[in-house]
A protein has these predicted regions:
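Charge-rich, low-complexity N-terminal segments
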Residues: 1-48, 54-112
């Protein structure tokens, strides 16, 4: 059990730092809509981490485009993450579009 809670805290710390790093990036596509880092699932050895993001896009910007921007900036985000968290090996980041909120909105519309 202690291992899982430690990994959960590490995932949450990584998520918070990624949110801060993305917030400082200057790409207008990232600030065009509402971008949310939903969760992070890091490997036990921190070799990689899946970052699930949700996006309510603005006009002219698609969620796939935003995920593409994040994937291209993954190297920068990874190096900044390692610097801020003072970890020896920062995980390789894989950004994945989390469509859970879009699915929930769709179900909500069907119920109404």
């Amino acid at each position: 059990m202690p291992q899982n809670s430690k990994r959960g805290r590490m995932n949450e710390d990584i998520r918070r730092q990624i949110i801060a790093i993305i917030g400082e990036m200057k790409d207008p596509r990232l600030s065009a809509g509402l971008l949310t880092v939903m969760r992070v699932e890091a490997a036990p050895d921190l070799s990689s981490a899946r970052v699930y993001v949700s996006m309510l896009p603005a006009q002219g910007v698609t969620a796939a485009e935003v995920v593409g921007v994040l994937r291209r900036a993954a190297g920068h985000i990874r190096s900044e993450l390692g610097r801020r968290m003072h970890i020896r090996r920062s995980p390789e980041l894989l950004f994945i579009e989390d469509d859970g909120s879009a699915y929930a909105a769709h179900i909500n519309e069907l119920i109404r």
